């Protein structure tokens, strides 16, 4: 049997209707969302390009949910500083996106942020 308190529902902002983003964000808690999943894509590591820290800064003004920043970018260590200033709870990077895993893990931890590692 699935125990709801042992799982976290994390909603991706990319799935939102951007013309109604404010209302979509307000609805998240009502639907049991416990965390925001914020995809960052650079057009190099993945083909698509998505939002950066400026948009997340605006979004965080309207939510009180933890944020997991998912860096789908080449050289993710270049993005850690910007997102750490936004008081995010987790930064996830792709194992394949960097050769220096130890350094980026230490960098993220030095900002008192939890580390996530995504593997394709």
Describe the residue ranges of each PLM region:
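Glycine-rich, proline-tolerant flexible connector loops at the mouths of alpha/beta enzymes
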Residues: 36-53
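Conserved, mostly hydrophobic/aromatic
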Residues: 21, 28, 39, 83
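Conserved anion-binding
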Residues: 5, 17-20, 62, 78-79, ...
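Hydrophobic faces of well-ordered beta-strands that scaffold small-molecule active sites
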Residues: 7-12, 36-38, 59, 67-71, ...
